[in-house]
Amino acid sequence: MTREEAIARDLKRNVWTVMGLPFDCTTEQETTDHLIDAMLKEERCFFTTPNLNFAITAQNDSQFRDSVINSDWVVADGMPLIWIAKTLGIPLPERVAGSSVFERVRQEYKNPDRPIRVVFFGGPDGTAAEAFKKIAVDNSSMEVVGFYSPGFGSMDEMSDPEIIKQINQTDADLLIVALGAKRGQQWIELNRKQLDVPVISHLGAVINFVAGTVKRAPVWIQRSGLEWLWRIWEESSLFKRYWHDGRAFIWQYLTKIRPYKNLMQKQSQLPQIPLEFSFLNDSNTLQISGDAVHRNLSDLRSALIELIEEERIKVIDLKGLSRLDGSFIALLQLVQKQINISGHSLKLINLDSVHLQQFEYACVSDQFTIIQHPSPVDDVSLAPTQS
């Protein structure tokens, strides 16, 4: 895939920001089909499945957060995230659990002449080997072509070129990492450019579920949002994590989600204004005015794709903005991501107090360089990002 194709694919995604992270608006079936297609076409896909704990942790860990933004496909693997989305009018259709997607791939892909090749990296000692045995006898069109248990080594030790070489030699289609969410995402970010495996994902629970060392909750419990109780019953060590997440969720609701909903309701009463944008070549500034909401973003996406491909955009001026939604915020996150990949940085200017508050409620105000009232002496040049 060319750089131009990668930019276009990323910015055309239907993504919405929830708790500071951009989520693809997709279903479990669509995700399954997308991953199978990527594996068969050998197209790179970094697949990430944040749950509530993931989202809360990401708010205080920029490296962890960026691993989600840098992903190619992001799904909401937790009912609390779906509840938050519905509260804010964000159309995430359903929870998409990574372990459920893996099972769908096992059950729905039927081509024994071209099996999907999987390699496991991580997990408790012996668990990956047991998962290998289970998959080997289930007569599915999937085969495990390697499993590695790096133990508790350092990131450098787990990223040794010899380990990467061994993984690449498996000729796998899917790499499942199980190192704990933060370490797993960090390891993927550090090594994915050197890995030849097209689809890579941290799915820590999958190895345990396949091996049978941990039982998955019944479907009705998963859909009710009470899977955390089942997980505590199965793994008592998770109690502290869920206790922390529960407290953080209540605080988020009181200080971010409820005020965000109230603000969105007030904005919904404003008259609708068409989205307009223009580009100033002399300052490489894109000016946006009107309603930056999902239904109006198609032409803007096309313009942004062209500007990023040509490395012309350095500033987005939001002075004339009337209202915005989670789709526009997510688009800005992807725009900044692609500009950073090109070695440059993005600045947002003239964001008024209402929209700045909306950025705060959406947990993204610290993700952007925002200049409220730029003066002629402000440096808004397209400067290289700091590594």
Tell me the role of every PLM-derived stretch.
Residues 51-54, 179-184, 206, 320-321:
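Short glycine-rich anion-binding loops that position phosphate/pyrophosphate groups of nucleotides
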Residues 149-156, 196-232:
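Short, flexible loop segments at boundaries between secondary-structure elements
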Residues 167-181, 197:
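Proline-aspartate-enriched helix->loop->beta-strand connector
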Residues 80-87, 216-217, 221-265:
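A transmembrane-helix-recognition feature enriched in membrane-embedded lipid enzymes
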Residues 85-162, 166, 170:
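Conserved beta-alpha
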Residues 132, 185-194, 331-335:
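Short Gly/Thr/Asp-enriched flexible loops that form oxyanion-binding sites at enzyme active sites
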Residues 260-322, 334-387:
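STAS-like cytosolic regulatory interaction modules
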Residues 2-100:
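N-terminal nucleotide/polyanion-binding subdomain common to many enzyme families
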